Amino acid sequence: MKLAVFAVLISTVAAFVAPNGVQRAATTELNAERREFLSAAAVAAGLAFPLTANAIRDYENVGYLGGSEIVDVNNANVRVYLKMPGLYPTLAGKIASNGPYNAVGDLYNIPGLSGKEKELLKKYESRFTAQKPQADYVIDRFNNGLYR
């Protein structure tokens, strides 16, 4: 009798357990599906977050944009010329609108300069430098968005 009960219990349990061969195939299929899903998710994540641009965060000539006595005539905002009496707004606007300049001496070739303006340029010539124009700063030469 005990043997009969034991046989019934084993057959009942066996009905709910898959054979080893079927279980491995199902597991292999699930692993393959997981791998496909994860690879698709990785591709989607790569497309959702494209490579970032290599922007220059620390511009080596940032001091010439108004933080020192020397002013970069190609990249500085017109308000920087407030430090030099007589240049702002008229001559500063001419300097900003006629660049870029290869050298400080090119400032004297600005069309329409008066004799007085050339004298002012000569007075402050030692405080000017002509660095390579940087698009991030050239665009802000007239309006850098800073208001008092």
Swiss-Prot record:
It holds the Pfam family PsbU. The keyword Ribosomal protein does not apply. PSII is composed of 1 copy each of membrane proteins PsbA, PsbB, PsbC, PsbD, PsbE, PsbF, PsbH, PsbI, PsbJ, PsbK, PsbL, PsbM, PsbT, PsbX, PsbY, PsbZ, Psb30/Ycf12, at least 3 peripheral proteins of the oxygen-evolving complex and a large number of cofactors. It forms dimeric complexes. The oxygen-evolving complex may be composed of PsbO, PsbQ', PsbV and PsbU. One of its GO terms (cellular component) is photosystem II. One of the extrinsic, lumenal subunits of photosystem II (PSII), which stabilize and protect the oxygen-evolving complex. PSII is a light-driven water plastoquinone oxidoreductase, using light energy to abstract electrons from H(2)O, generating a proton gradient subsequently used for ATP formation. Stabilizes the structure of photosystem II oxygen-evolving complex (OEC), the ion environment of oxygen evolution and protects the OEC against heat-induced inactivation. NCBIfam families: PRK02515.1 (NF002708). It comes from the Eukaryota. Residues 1-32, 33-54 form a transit peptide. Belongs to the PsbU family. One of its GO terms (biological process) is photosynthesis. Keywords: Chloroplast, Electron transport, Membrane, Photosynthesis, Photosystem II, Plastid, Thylakoid, Transit peptide, Transport. Its main location: plastid. The keyword Chloroplast applies. It is a peripheral membrane protein. This is Photosystem II extrinsic protein U, chloroplastic. It is found in: Plastid, Chloroplast thylakoid membrane.
